A protein has these predicted regions:
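Active-site loop-to-helix "anion-binding N-cap" substructures in soluble metabolic enzymes
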Residues: 1-388
């Protein structure tokens, strides 16, 4: 993989960096989690130290191909500057629409942010002309938004094809971590939570080929428990999941991968039951794991060299049902295994547990892109950089 460190910057004066500043905010536009900003900081600082002018490009939310004030970076630019400790200048939607990047070219300032790239009609259509209107003013394009790289959008795919393009430092780390999960001969455990089997079936099928053990938690486990004939009361279930689950078990059996399910659960009445004690006559909802399940996870983790965690183990937004995920986060933070964590809700679970991300081998900020990469899908953002 070609790296930024090896590039000769003698003739490179203007650099575009596709970042992911699609940060969570509260009702007052205050950023509640700056992780994605901070992940781009190393690349931004590196390019700045090369005395290059920087154009940052990002999306925010889901505007409808037109300026919408609630999705404008004008509401967040001051916070971006403060968090990154850099003066960042906004190129507004109107300014770019009328004058292109003329202000970027003529100004003596160093770092600019184009307003929400999804305001522009050429973005989601991966339009060549729109892409060139930006890359014609650049000498180098860097993708530092792995989390958006499953989108075939102009700022992810076409811009990277127009000029010399490279991955950012965090993008490289994402690729390396995912390749470790898929290709390393080390003994691997996948811990998969979330609510729907259908959204993760391809990921699970892929993981049965590379992992020795898979633990299913979260609301998704309800479907697996029901498939095994265990009563789940009024717990959240996905319709027509049996065929998918049967396929997962068949693939796992052929590959020598063992599927593990919770041994005990916490219900909506904050009562703990072993799964063999759940009654078919009771009105209950399964909302978390309990101690026996955590002990099983502890045992599986201790036998694994690489551990992947994606998806919370319970309804973490309620403190009564976040304990299972917090206990798991604590176990993983003290493990000697290479722990790779991915998915927005999983990151929230770690934050709720009060554990620092640097206690793990790697924490991915990507959601859909992370899962699609595990499924061996070709991501448009990766393909454009010729990274495989």
């Amino acid at each position: 993989m070609e790296s930024l460190i090896k590039i000769n910057f003698q003739k490179i004066k203007s650099v575009g960096i596709r970042v992911d500043f699609n940060v969570p905010i509260d009702e007052n536009f205050v950023i509640t989690d700056a992780t994605r900003l901070l992940r781009a900081a190393e690349t931004i600082k590196f390019i700045k130290e090369k005395n290059c002018k920087i154009l940052l490009i990002s999306h925010f939310g889901r505007p409808k191909d037109i300026f919408e004030n609630q999705y404008s970076f004008q509401n967040l630019i001051e916070q971006f500057s403060k968090i990154l400790n850099e003066k960042i200048n906004l190129i507004s939607f109107d300014d770019f629409s009328k004058k292109g990047l003329s202000h970027f070219k003529q100004s003596k300032e160093n770092i600019f942010l184009l307003d929400n790239i999804r305001f522009f009609k050429g973005e989601k259509t991966n339009d060549m002309n729109f892409s060139q209107s930006i890359t014609d003013e650049l000498d180098l394009f860097i993708n530092e938004a792995f989390s958006a790289s499953h989108r075939s959008h102009a700022s992810v795919n076409q811009m990277a094809k127009n000029i010399l393009s490279l991955p950012g430092f965090n993008f490289e780390k994402e690729i390396i971590a995912i390749n470790e999960i898929k290709n390393s001969p080390k003994k691997k455990l996948a811990i998969i939570g979330g609510s729907k089997v259908s959204t993760k079936i391809n990921t699970l099928l892929s993981l049965t080929q590379s992992c020795s053990n898979i633990f299913i938690g979260g609301a998704m486990a309800n479907n697996f428990l029901k498939f095994k004939g265990i009563p789940v009361g009024e717990s959240l279930l996905e319709a027509d999941s049996d065929k998918m689950i049967e396929e997962i078990y068949d693939n796992a059996k052929k590959s020598g991968c063992e599927i593990h399910l919770p041994l005990d659960v916490v219900t909506d009445k904050v009562e703990t039951f072993s799964i063999d004690k759940l009654s078919s006559n009771s009105n209950f909802k399964i909302l978390d794991l309990s101690d026996s399940s955590i002990n099983l996870l502890d045992n599986l983790i201790s036998k694994s060299e690489i551990v992947l965690w994606n998806g919370p183990m319970g309804m973490i937004e309620n403190e009564n049902f976040s304990r299972g995920s917090s206990k798991l986060a604590s176990l993983l933070s003290h493990s000697s295994s290479q722990v790779v964590i991915g998915g927005g809700d999983t990151l929230l679970a770690i934050n709720i547990a009060g554990i620092n991300f640097d206690q793990f081998y790697f924490v991915s900020t990507a959601g859909g892109a992370f899962l699609e990469a595990l499924e061996d899908k070709v991501l448009p953002g990766v393909e454009a950089l010729n990274l495989g």
